[in-house]
Amino acid sequence: AASDVYKRQRVQGNLPAMEYYRRKCDFIPAVMEAYESLSREYDVIVIEGAGSPAEINLQENDIVNMGLARMVDAPVLLVGDIDRGGVFAQLYGTVALQSEEDKKRIKGVVVNKFRGDRAILEPGLKMLEQLCGVPVAGVVPYLSVDIDDEDSLSERFGRGREPRLIDIAVIRLPRISNFTDFSPFEHYANVSLRYVERVRDLRAPDMIVLPGTKSTIADLGWLRQSGLEAAIKKAASGGTLVFGVCGGYQMLGRHISDPEQVEAACVTEIDGMGLLPGETVFEGAKVQTQTSGVFSGVEGLLSVLNGKRYAGYEIHMGRSEARGALISAGNVYGSYVHGIFDEQEVTDTILKALCEKRGVSFKALGNFDWKAYKERQYDLLADAVRAGLDMKLIYRILEREV
């Protein structure tokens, strides 16, 4: 196992587990600098832990759970997932395995993803409070809300298998990232969004998408070995719209080089797919920026995007020769901008172009406002969390009264 480590936006390397644990204390000054910068700007900072604070083999020099809470003197809420089962053992065991100092830092426990009548849970909650000596700060129900998943935890990859009026195939790269870029397409009534990892499943989609990846060179190698690269190039030559985002865009170019081994791959250079102009060179500094503007210079089927506004963000290693919000060559397109499909006008315009090419009515796809939908989902989540938590206790914890 290894971890990609970044400090102040610069790559520190792909560190094997033992080397990371040996060096992690070196990163504390950067962690504290980031925290202090945030504390000057915000009244409340929420720190999400990583993994479990009960992993006692990792507690020495910890910088992501209780260790960080100690460094910044933060009170702690311990959250357990009851949907996976064994939540009382999780919460009690986690508290029991803490040092006496860290036990005092835990100000409340929360049961998350509860299904059913809370009254059934009450006897267990009372026993948990007695055993842990920590109040139960709330029970949050299991919610059917549609919010973004973590790349490694998504259950969406199996959805939308049956082609509909417009069929979009996203290549499921082994190290796929930012796949939620394409979520807006899922909500049109007659659009199917499929994740494909085998040539036989590609079929004949209206649009092929190459998504972002945590390792462009390695995933391009996989794409080549799997036969999907050849299948995509054949589809592109037949007129299928191909769209690459971030790492997917880099793959579509002529060449990729990594002289500093930023991606820590055995291969430091590789020929791209050659469907877009330009080359990409990886370098130590990571691009992280928000971006917005108006499309211009777009050619081919998606030339109808010219004059339309876009907004999103870039987060990537490597710089490409060809720059601009959207690079095009025939029916092949590439962009570094994540969130480019969140703008309804952009998504509608692309789907209209696909419908026109196919000779079907755009109205048959249905109408969908992605931004309004996302706001409703987060409002539902916020309302349920607020209703499930003892907010008086939460505010007392924030005010250091507990």
Where are these regions (language model features)?
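Flexible phosphate-sensing "switch/lid" loops adjacent to ATP/NTP-binding sites
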Residues: 1-236, 241, 258-261, 284, ...
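Catalytic nucleophile serine of serine hydrolases
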Residues: 246
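A conserved active-site-flanking secondary-structure segment within enzyme catalytic domains
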Residues: 253-308
